[in-house]
């Protein structure tokens, strides 16, 4: 399901960067590299892990997007997500104190990653991109989001365990119960991301849903093709981590994080 080989023809190998450039520069009117502050290193070096991630070294002046994309829809989503995170860091107001540029609430950065990776999930975008395969794509996207959210939710009691690192049996049991499938311990451990806590990931999803609704209501369902939306995002990114996820949600007009919007997005993707 993650690899989605049947959809590969829509994203030939080595086409991910051109696709991302089209979305970010032609659609939103943003510079992919943020005037050189974002450094791209996507060459297939030996030993480099598969996938793409963003790493902020000096915010906002040095942000790296690194990895080894193999092609296909999954890597296209991952690259867009990494660039969403990178653009947020690279547009942070440099006059902010260090703790407001690089520390603070990680859920805010996670939200921009989820928001950009989810551009392909937008109905109007996906229908044009995938054509006759659009329903296959939307079903896959919705299923993966459900799997991911349930897997993250399963980590909450594990990470709050006062006894420390849980045993294999407990990890496997929690993952299996969340997904409704028998998950062996080695696979379950892969889902435990030591750099991002479960609550951070969940709050990132919720903030992304709030931002997505605001973008749609202000700039239309094709917000990802609006340069005004790009300027709006740039203004929000300038805040850095001045606000936590709940505060930023209120700053853009919501009454805090909206979990109902997360559910609506899941239902909408599969509608």
Report the location of each language-model feature:
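Feature representing long, continuous alpha-helical segments
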Residues: 85, 110-118, 152, 156, ...
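Helical catalytic core of nucleic-acid polymerases
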Residues: 90-137
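C-terminal, non-catalytic "cap/extension" segments appended to globular domains
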Residues: 160-271
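Active-site-adjacent bridging/hinge elements
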Residues: 51-64, 82-93, 128-134, 175-185
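Contiguous, non-catalytic segments that form substrate-binding/exosite surfaces or channel walls
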Residues: 1-73, 251, 263
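Long, amphipathic alpha-helical stalk/connector segments used for oligomerization, subunit docking
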Residues: 118-195
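Glycine- and acidic
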Residues: 2-10, 60-73, 93-102, 136-143, ...
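Active-site recognition of the HExxH zinc-binding catalytic motif
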Residues: 70-93, 110-114
